[in-house]
Amino acid sequence: MFGSRKASRRRSYRSRSTMGSRVDIDFCKFEEPPSPREGERRCLFVLDPLEHYVESKDRMVELLPGRVETVDGVNTYYINGCTTEEKFPGLDYTCYRVDLRDTYRSRCAVPPEATPEEKFISHRHRKLIPYNSRKPVVVYLPEDAQLHYRIWTGGQEVVAKKAEE
């Protein structure tokens, strides 16, 4: 019983080649988004299907674009930039374009014995988007960037009480 439900939701990928071609994944059908611009790459993924009420009321996706950089292990690092929404003609879903700029760090003194390390540094202003398994998440990034994401789950609603006087 458990296995049969999961097995029916497995994704089947078909080849994706040009704009206008149809991509079918069991629960998510969509038109191929445009190719990335020069100096960019495209990340495309679909989310696991959930009940409609859960998707619309209880889940959000946080996009975490960033780069792997050498850091000192002491300071806090972040990348400036912006994430914008784009609608393309013929597509019924939103695409996102990320512009990553300079990396900044806090100004803590670094001890001489600290060793530099490679670490993923994320964009300072993260984007929360609605969870929707029926549409793909398409993000255009600079070639040297990576995309991480988190699924946020809402908790139980709590009614705020009036402040006592």
UniProtKB/Swiss-Prot annotation:
Pfam families listed in its UniProt record: Ecotin
Per the record, the coiled-coil ranges are none
Single Gene Ontology MF annotation: serine-type endopeptidase inhibitor activity
Listed GO cellular component terms? flagellum attachment zone; paraflagellar rod
Family classification: Belongs to the protease inhibitor I11 (ecotin) family.
The molecule here is called Ecotin-like protein 4
Which organism was this protein described from?
Trypanosoma brucei brucei (strain 927/4 GUTat10.1)
